[in-house]
């Protein structure tokens, strides 16, 4: 199976999400699947660096957590890449930009999309706006 993992967080960023995705990728590849990571650019990765089966999309720092990134384009490029690698399924790992792009790709290619919900946002509320909602 050709599997596309869509995430706003991937190595070299260090997080539980990035580690979870790498673990999933490795396990799926051990079972004979082809796994493709669709993720954000990272300032620690030189432009033009070749990362097998990793596709990076233009991104900027996320507003509240500047060590995290959010893609600001990539719908058409991701769809083109997904067609080229003949994705069978999309697995989104974020509710943000790359998650939306992944859902768009699945819809365009008429393939299934599944989602993993990693973050309990209510547990992070105290980090954003000192715990106050707008």
Model-based region annotation:
Residues 1-58, 82-83:
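N-terminal subdomain of nucleotide-sugar transferases
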Residues 8, 117-120:
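Histidine-centered beta-alpha loop that forms part of the nucleotide-sugar donor binding/catalytic region
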Residues 63-89, 98-104, 108:
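An amphipathic, basic-hydrophobic alpha-helix
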Residues 93-98, 117:
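Short His-centered aromatic/hydrophobic patch
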Residues 112-114, 122-134:
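Nucleotide-sugar donor phosphate/pyrophosphate-binding loop at the beta->alpha transition
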């Amino acid at each position: 199976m050709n599997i596309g993992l869509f995430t706003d967080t991937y190595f070299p960023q260090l997080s539980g999400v990035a580690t979870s995705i790498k673990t999933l990728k490795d396990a799926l590849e051990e079972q004979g699947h082809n796994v493709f990571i669709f993720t954000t650019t990272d300032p620690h990765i030189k432009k033009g660096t070749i990362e097998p089966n990793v596709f990076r999309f233009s991104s900027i720092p996320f507003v509240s957590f500047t060590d995290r990134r959010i893609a600001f384009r990539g719908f058409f490029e991701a769809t083109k890449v997904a067609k080229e690698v003949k994705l069978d399924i999309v697995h989104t790992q974020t509710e943000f930009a790359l998650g939306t792009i992944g859902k768009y790709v699945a819809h365009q290619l008429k393939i299934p999309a599944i989602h993993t919900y990693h973050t309990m946002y209510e547990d992070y509320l105290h980090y954003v706006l000192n715990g106050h909602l707008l």
